[in-house]
A protein has these predicted regions:
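Soluble catalytic regions of large protease machineries
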Residues: 1-183
Length: 183
């Protein structure tokens, strides 16, 4: 509920991607921790759905994992969005200057802090992966309906995804006779 609204989903290949999910970014000047958690959770969704449905994972979610990791890293290192690390910001890797210890590669924090940062990034990713799993298990029927609609139509809009998820929960759709996707 805190991230940008879903616009469209397609299973048609786009560039290197086997399918794409588009959102409609809202104009914002600042972003909350909850916003980034939702973005990471959404990025984990495809990989987790594959685990739930097929009981395996493949390399298809590589870009999603890369984006999720980058956001989690920035949450911890730049935006002070980690309770474990606290309100600290660490600049990106600096160039190594003559006489500087090559082992630290220009870091402005200790090996112990680097370990804590890595642990916190991993915790955020695992937490949002579990959240995605819990949501997809709860909405499994909706997931199956969305998947079937994508197989039938290749592309569906965000409103159709919402209707299919509501249908999967047994909730009445706002437009009960509307089964054609709006693309």
């Amino acid at each position: 509920p805190n991230s940008d609204p879903l616009h469209k989903v397609t299973i048609l290949p786009r560039g290197m991607a086997l399918g794409v999910t588009w959102t409609l970014p809202e104009e914002r000047h600042t972003y909350s921790r909850e916003y980034f958690q939702d973005v990471i959770c959404k990025a984990m969704g495809g990989r987790v759905a594959e685990q739930i449905v097929f009981d395996h994972v493949n390399s298809g979610a590589a870009n999603d994992l890369e984006q999720a990791t980058m956001i989690a890293r920035r949450m911890v290192r730049e935006w002070g969005m980690s309770d474990a690390i606290g309100p600290m910001a660490f600049a990106g890797q600096q160039q190594v200057f003559l006489g500087e210890d090559l082992m630290t590669s220009g870091r402005e924090y200790s090996d112990e802090m680097a370990r804590k940062i890595d642990e916190e990034i991993g915790r955020i990713l695992r937490e949002q992966e579990q959240r995605a799993r819990d949501l997809l298990v709860k909405h499994r029927r909706g997931l199956d309906l969305v998947a079937q609609s994508l197989l039938d139509n290749e592309t569906i809009d965000g409103a159709m995804v919402s209707r299919l998820i509501q249908q999967g929960l047994g909730e009445p759709s706002k437009q009960p006779n509307d089964t054609k996707p709006n693309v």
